[in-house]
Amino acid sequence: MSFSSAERTKMVALFHELGPDAPTLCEGWTTRDLAAHLWVRENRLDASAGLFIPALKPRLDTVTEEVLERDYDEVVDDWGKGAHKFNPLRYVDKVLNSAEHFVHHEDIRRANGRTEARDFSAATQNELHLPLKMMGSSFLSKSTLPVVLEAEGFPPIVTADKHGVADKGDAVVRVRGTVSEVLLWAFGRDAAQVQIV
């Protein structure tokens, strides 16, 4: 089972354990909102485009409201089955969902008293490093200072380096921790256990 699939399975169990009204780290969202987001993102590509294209956001909002009106456990179980047979996302699950499932699993865990960071195998850390490397710059593009992401065991990732000073180490923010925690931080989660210097 891939890491992405394992995280999906664990999230389904946690969604059911906590019910639809539990908090998450996603500001303003309950577990019902997060489950609806995950279902729409994976099952309604026409609507999920609204996550990235502002003109399509009204469609996203309409479809999300429809999903929120469905039975919570049914939505969770349907999402838990993964992308349907003819859904193109089924074939890129590992690449597309490793970070998404990890971060949202932590959103649920940490908002509900399970605050300890999890230990992962070297293979999983490698799998989580790829999205950090690919998306770190876009997540931190608005930073006024260069940010150096220093995940343990990996080369530093320099982001938001508009003036070319990061290589010299001047006037930068350094974020240190395991790759999983640095990834959480890059996704904007204050609960990430990182050192910022």
Regions found by a protein language model. Give the residues of each.
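Structured surface interface patches that mediate subunit assembly and partner/cofactor docking
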Residues: 3, 17-21, 44-59, 74, ...
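Short, structural beta-strand-to-alpha-helix junction motif
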Residues: 30-31, 71, 178
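N-terminal accessory alpha/beta regions
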Residues: 36, 69-73
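An N-terminal domain-cap segment
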Residues: 1-50
